[in-house]
Every structure is written in structure tokens, then in C-alpha cells.
Amino acid sequence: GAHSDKRILFHEDITGEAITSKLYEAVKKLPNVTIFEHTTMVDIVEEDNICYGAVIRREDGTLETVEANETVWACGGIGGLYRHSTNFRHLTGDALALALHHKVRLKNINYVQIHPTTFFLRDEQERSFLISESVRGEGAKLYDKNMNRFVNELLPRDLLTEAIYEQMEKDHTEHVWEDLRTIPEEELRTHFPNIVEHCRQMGHDVPKECIPLVPAQHHFMGGVW
């Protein structure tokens, strides 16, 4: 958003996945790193205001204590607390609650970014599918319930989100519409294959019809001080 020329760097329509998957593969090759998957932090080991590690729950439910001289506390997201979120539903801010329990200061927990365009789902237990803003950079348009444009699609995320919420309230609807038919079909299928496929699975043929969109919680910038 907030751009007047095409300047978004992306990999198809899965930029985030492309970056994180490459980083993850690089970390797995490091000889001094052990990765515990499907593992939850239950508590930290703390004495006299010093952290000595963490208590974790493995996938099979067993509890273990991991001792450490240094502990980096990466709290993760809070998307599971929202009706619509691009985050996984199990991200509910547990680490922030633990921080408060141990009297650890938090910072910027009011810094929550709402992405203006995700595919609208009535099932609130499902993770919201992000419709990349790069499609708007390529010419996609937004419409109200009467199929009238109501906003400049290239506004910054916060302003566009506000405009969409205002239109939804005005129309008494749960979503607005996005029209990707302004983008040539070959370009759609080449540049945004995952969006096209996901919408197809949801019963919408992107090259032929509009899709329902709703803003959703996306990034959480706060955490431990």
C-alpha cells in the first residue's frame, strides 16, 4: 500500500513462505542448533529474577526442563485472540501471560497490524488466507455490496483497513468484494497461483468473479521489554 508505482518485491503470492522456508532450511543445517517441533513453553525456570531455562511440553504431553545460561524469549503472535487472523489459531499470547506472571515488562503490545484484505470465511476456527496487496498493485479493485468502488486501493494498510471497516458498517455486511478480473488471466495464474487455487477451493473462480474480503489481524509488534 501507499505506493504510486509498482515497487513490491515478491515471490509469486507466497513471499513470506518463500523467505521463512529458506531461513528454516539454513537453520536446520547448523551443527549447534537443535529444533524441537510441536513443543510448547509451559513456564520459565526463574530464581532471584534470573532465567535459567524453560519448562516445555513435548508433542506426546511429557514435560521437560531445558536448562540454559542464556534464554531468548520470542513470544510469537496473538492472532488466536481475534475473530479473523492470518496467524495460526494456537497463537494466543501465552508467552506474554507468562511474562506478566514473572513480572517481566512488556513493550508495544498495542502495536497490532491489521491486514486489509484476507479471504472472508464464516468458520472462525480457520486461519484467514491473505490476499496479497500486490494484486492491488497490479490493478485489482475493491467494491461495496452494490459493486461500487469506495476507496483508493493503494492506501497504506491502516487507512485502507479503516475504509473497509467503515464501508462494511455502512452496508451492514461482513465483507467487501475484490475484483481481480482487471488483471489478465495469464498473469493471474502465473503471478498469483496460490490465490487462484485457494479461491477455487473455496468455490470462487477468480478470473470470472469477485471474491469476498475482510480485514484480519496480521502482525504483532509487541513483546518482552
Q: What spans do the regions from the language model cover?
A:
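Short, solvent-exposed loop/turn segments at the edges of secondary structure
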Residues: 3, 75, 93, 135-138
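Flavin (primarily FAD) binding-site architecture
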Residues: 73-87
